[in-house]
């Protein structure tokens, strides 16, 4: 006879679900409002989305470190809290970019904002669990929403970008599912902390090591797709080019933060178990990714594609910190992205500000270098701000990403990987060329005579976001130490 199962509300610890429930409820509220009144202005949806994200931020801050909830599938540790805060802050920065002076129809759809909030919830589920099924559900929820958001830009290359991203995402999901199935077959569990205990007790068995090799390869391929690591990066430039500029900037930060968290949990477990070849493969992928992406960025004719390859290179830079498997290395991942999101979102937002009619500068690209020729004479403050973002991405002191690069290289040296720090330094020098190339165009080239080919998509909310990102980039020297201290405390409290 079946026995009744008694589950107390206290044991469920539903507070661990609060941030995700806020985002999901917010998306449903937006859809209900649209059903009630079809004529609401997009500014209402923007403000409502920001309000929901602020509440989500508060709910995340209120979580206690190292708690489990909802049948133990939710894991609230320092890694999950820090990554959720990064995801929410980047989402808050992105949302006002919908309030442009020119009309872009995707932002007039309430479905856009509802899908956006569902996507945020999906990423939060990914980072707040060590249960492989819930990670997969969060991954697919976020990915399916993101594919749709790309396609809503409603241009032929946007549809192409959405299909490419969907295809690559489906492949990554298949590899993740197969890798997870191998882990379950080996251990009888889908919770990573239990998986680690079972594998530790059986290390040394020949058959087990072969199976671990198989699962590791499958999962490495899955996350190489998601993080756009070499040689699984080829989709990224085309997808970034087809997406709207703000969404491309968002994609360069938030999905990667979520993927890094899951990678830390899975590959950190393998490295801790002594599967040293996983560390070696990650280091090789890191070096190849940052180097080849930088070389490809050198020959790009379009600023947006250059920034796409730049984002790939930065992902390669950061994946090296994961291979270190130290508290300092893990801290470096979140510290770097905490600085990177302001600069990169700001740079993509600057592309959103200036557009050229009928592609007169270039038949293929929306943002060719020629469009920015003499930008200092046409839009002086815009040129200065864009130069700040480029100098920061190049790692020039005292701008924000300089401190991130220094911290990552310091973590590598402290772990005994001096050669890795040297490779990082050389790649930063290569990258400086293509960032400074745009600065040269803006400050030293003459503007195109027919200035009417360019129009400016300016609005006060957009200028506020770009201004805030610029201030955060310049003033990093004043908050890097508190930020590092907070992240280090949260990471060490989680045992990483």
Swiss-Prot record:
One of its GO terms (cellular component) is plasma membrane. The chain crosses the membrane at residues 12-32, 43-63, 79-99, 108-128, 132-152, 166-186, 207-227, 257-277, 280-300, 306-326, 333-353, 383-403, 416-436, 464-484. It catalyses: a quinone + NADH + 5 H(+)(in) = a quinol + NAD(+) + 4 H(+)(out). Pfam families: Proton_antipo_M. It is a multi-pass membrane protein. It is found in: Cell inner membrane. One of its GO terms (molecular function) is NADH dehydrogenase (ubiquinone) activity. GO terms for biological process: ATP synthesis coupled electron transport. Its main location: membrane. Keywords: Cell inner membrane, Cell membrane, Membrane, NAD, Quinone, Translocase, Transmembrane, Transmembrane helix, Transport, Ubiquinone. Its EC number is 7.1.1.-. Belongs to the complex I subunit 2 family. NDH-1 is composed of 14 different subunits. Subunits NuoA, H, J, K, L, M, N constitute the membrane sector of the complex. NDH-1 shuttles electrons from NADH, via FMN and iron-sulfur (Fe-S) centers, to quinones in the respiratory chain. The immediate electron acceptor for the enzyme in this species is believed to be ubiquinone. Couples the redox reaction to proton translocation (for every two electrons transferred, four hydrogen ions are translocated across the cytoplasmic membrane), and thus conserves the redox energy in a proton gradient. PANTHER family: NADH DEHYDROGENASE. NCBIfam families: NDH_I_N, PRK05777.2-2. This is NADH-quinone oxidoreductase subunit N. The gene is nuoN.
């Amino acid at each position: 006879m079946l026995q009744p199962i008694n589950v107390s509300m206290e044991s469920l610890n539903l507070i661990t679900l609060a941030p995700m429930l806020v985002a999901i409820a917010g998306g449903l509220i937006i859809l209900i409002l649209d059903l009630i009144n079809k004529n609401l202005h997009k500014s209402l949806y923007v403000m409502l989305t920001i309000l929901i994200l602020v509440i989500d931020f508060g709910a995340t801050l209120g979580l206690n470190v190292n708690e489990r909830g909802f049948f133990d599938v939710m894991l609230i540790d320092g890694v999950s809290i820090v990554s959720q805060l990064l995801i929410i802050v980047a989402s808050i920065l992105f949302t006002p970019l919908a309030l442009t002076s020119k009309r872009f129809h995707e932002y007039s759809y309430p479905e856009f904002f509802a899908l956006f909030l569902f996507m945020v919830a999906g990423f939060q589920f990914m980072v707040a669990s060590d249960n492989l099924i819930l990670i997969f559900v969060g991954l697919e929820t976020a990915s399916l929403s993101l594919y749709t958001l790309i396609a809503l830009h409603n241009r032929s290359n946007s549809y192409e970008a959405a299909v490419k991203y969907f295809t690559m995402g489906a492949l990554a999901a298949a590899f993740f599912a197969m890798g997870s199935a191998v882990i379950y077959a080996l251990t009888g569990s889908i919770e990573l902390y239990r998986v680690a205990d079972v594998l530790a007790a059986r290390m040394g068995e020949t058959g087990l090591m072969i199976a671990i090799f198989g699962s590791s390869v499958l999962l490495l391929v899955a996350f190489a797709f998601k993080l756009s690591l070499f040689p699984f990066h080829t989709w990224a430039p085309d997808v970034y080019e087809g997406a709207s500029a703000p969404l491309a900037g968002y994609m360069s930060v938030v999905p990667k933060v979520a993927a890094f968290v899951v990678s830390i949990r899975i590959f950190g477990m393998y490295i801790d178990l002594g599967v040293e070849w996983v560390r070696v493969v990650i280091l090789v992928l890191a070096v190849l990714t940052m180097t080849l992406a930088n070389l490809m960025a050198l020959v790009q004719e379009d600023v947006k594609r250059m920034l796409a390859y730049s984002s790939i290179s930065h992902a390669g830079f950061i994946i090296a910190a994961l291979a270190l498997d130290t508290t300092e290395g893990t801290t470096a991942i979140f510290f770097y992205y905490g600085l990177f999101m302001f600069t990169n979102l700001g740079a993509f937002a600057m592309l959103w500000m200036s557009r050229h009619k009928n592609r007169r500068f270039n038949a293929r690209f929306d943002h060719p270098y020629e469009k920015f020729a003499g930008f200092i004479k046409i839009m002086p403050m815009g040129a200065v701000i864009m130069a700040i973002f480029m100098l920061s991405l190049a790692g020039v002191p005292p701008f924000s990403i300089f401190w991130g690069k220094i911290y990552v290289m310091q973590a590598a040296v402290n772990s005994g990987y001096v050669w890795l720090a040297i490779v990082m330094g050389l790649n930063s020098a290569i990258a400086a060329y293509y960032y400074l190339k745009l600065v040269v165009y803006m400050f030293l080239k003459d503007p195109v005579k027919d200035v009417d080919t360019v129009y400016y998509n300016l609005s006060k909310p957009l200028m506020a976001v770009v201004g805030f990102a610029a201030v955060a980039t310049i003033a990093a020297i004043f908050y890097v130490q508190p930020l590092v201290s907070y992240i280090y405390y949260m990471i060490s409290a989680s045992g990483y």
